[in-house]
Amino acid sequence: VREAALESLGRMDGTPVLVRARGWARRPDALGAAAGQLLACRGSADDGPLVLAALREAVRGTGPDGPALWSLVDGAGRLGIAQAAPVLRHLYRETASSHLRGRTAQALAATDATFARGFAVECLWDCEETTREVGARHAATGDQRVVGRLRRLAADPAEEAEVQTAVRSRIGPDTAAI
C-alpha cells in the first residue's frame, strides 16, 4: 500500500501537490524522496535546493545507479541547478548505466560551466548515441582531438542520424570549416 501511495504521488499534478511536496521534500524517508522526485519533474527554479538535496541523498543512499536518480538528474538539468554539477560529475564517472550517463551528460550541459572543455569531449567517444550527440553539440573545438573526432563522426556512414545532425550543425556541410 505504501509503495502504491508513493507511486500515485508522482502522478499527481497541480499547484496544491507541489506545495505539499515542498514541505515533504525535507523528510528523510520515502515520502521525502518521492516529493523530491516530483519537484524534479514538475517544480520550478525555486525548488532547486530541494531537488539538489534529494539528488545528494539518493546518491548517498543508493549509490550511482539508484532508480530515483533518473528523474533527479533530469530535474537538475531542467532547473539548471549549477550547484548540482559536482554530484552530476560523480554520477557520470561512476554509474554503470550508459543510459543514465547520457542523461547525466545532458544535465551537465545545462549546469556545468566547464562541460564543453571536459565531459563533453569525453562524450564524443561514448557507446551511447545520445551521449555522443550531447558531446557533438557541446564539445569545445579548440582541441585537435575534438575536431578530428567530429570529422570522423560526420563521415561515418554507420553513425546514428541524430549524432551526424548534431555534428553537422556545428561544422556545416564543409567539414574543413572547423
Protein language model features and the residues they cover:
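Buried hydrophobic core positions in alpha-solenoid tandem helical repeats
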Residues: 18-22, 50-56, 87-90, 118-121, ...
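Alpha-helical junction/boundary sensor with strong preference for TPR arrays
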Residues: 28, 58-59, 95, 127, ...
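Structural detector for internal amphipathic alpha-helices that build alpha-solenoid repeat scaffolds
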Residues: 1-14, 19-26, 30-45, 63-81, ...
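Short, 15-30-residue, compositionally biased linear elements
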Residues: 85, 113-114
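C-terminal, beta-strand-rich globular interaction domains
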Residues: 64, 124-125, 151-158, 162
